[in-house]
Amino acid sequence: MNPEQFKVLDPKESYTFSKYFDLPFSIQDIVADLGYKFDRSSLRLPTEPGIHLRLNDLTLYLTRNLKWVRPVAEITRREIFIFPILAELCDYVEVMLNDEYSLSVNQWLKGNLDYYIETADHRRMLVIEAKQSDLTRGFTQLAAELAALDLRSSTQGNMLYGAVTTGDLWRFGQLDRSLKVITEDTIVYRVPDELAQILEILAGVLKEAN
């Protein structure tokens, strides 16, 4: 590799997914070095309204946790806010939830995905917990993980989806595989007020055609 063709990433360096969170460079330059363009816009995401019927108990559970628990440790935030949402999703879609899913594409794209879901017909969703509750830098990490999924996958399907979350805030992202564009949604969804929309999108990604 010719070092002059890259803006910020060092061809001699090795980068794990979590390292992208700490890089001081712009997301535009990072994804350009990975071979993609970056965009930020309001996404028209797939939805699955049927999951509405399962909201009551989960809403009560999360509302209680938000009232009485102020987690400092990231593992606590995952266990009491993120995991219950994804467990409900996987039960509805009837698919396994993979946590700390190992993925290695090359020296720039390797590490563990916090949560990764893939259906039998290869619809995929990945979710990461934003370190330090920073959605902006968390999305840079998400972009790298979406790029890794794109490069690893040989199956059909034009779109890949992911989300970065603090537990109570969720932001979605999309990778267009044909255009090589990673798009960050401008909308941030809140739990519990917009839990229905979050679950509709998560289920829509896994149940509707890309």
Model-found features: residue ranges?
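A short, conserved, highly charged catalytic patch centered on acidic carboxylates
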Residues: 2-161, 169-210
